[in-house]
Amino acid sequence: MIIGIGSDLCNIERIQKSLDRFGERFVVRVFTDVERAKAERRVLTRAATYAKRFAAKEAFSKAVGTGFRAGVFMKDIGVANLPSGAPTLVLTGGAKARLDALTPPGHAVDVHLTMTDDHPWAQAFVILYARPL
């Protein structure tokens, strides 16, 4: 059963302005080490890479129904890739706690994430699916 759906649209140019204005302070506060390493390897699409991940964090916060309140912080939501290359979320801290609280007894949650960009927009969708154990 679906227990949460979230989507977000992020302006890549807005992320570029944050990178220009706040630099390392912005990326360290918002993104995980894995996310930063991936974005920094992509010199030509650095801002778009960050924007997609920013949108994924926002989409997850909507899927769990809290936004960035109730102990859910951006850095607790990390985008990583499965061996197949498909994106997924790695959750820690308040983000993991909130998802655990939403998970019905006797179920596990699969997090489905898709991201895309077409300048100047980056978009992400998150579906939280509870499956019986």
Swiss-Prot record:
Taxonomic classification: Bacteria, Pseudomonadati, Pseudomonadota, Alphaproteobacteria, Sphingomonadales
GO MF terms, alphabetically ordered: holo-[acyl-carrier-protein] synthase activity; magnesium ion binding
Cofactors, names only: Mg(2+)
Protein name from the UniProt record: Holo-[acyl-carrier-protein] synthase
Pfam families attached to this UniProt entry: ACPS
Keyword Protein transport: no
GO cellular component: cytoplasm
Keywords from the named record: Cytoplasm, Fatty acid biosynthesis, Fatty acid metabolism, Lipid biosynthesis, Lipid metabolism, Magnesium, Metal-binding, Transferase
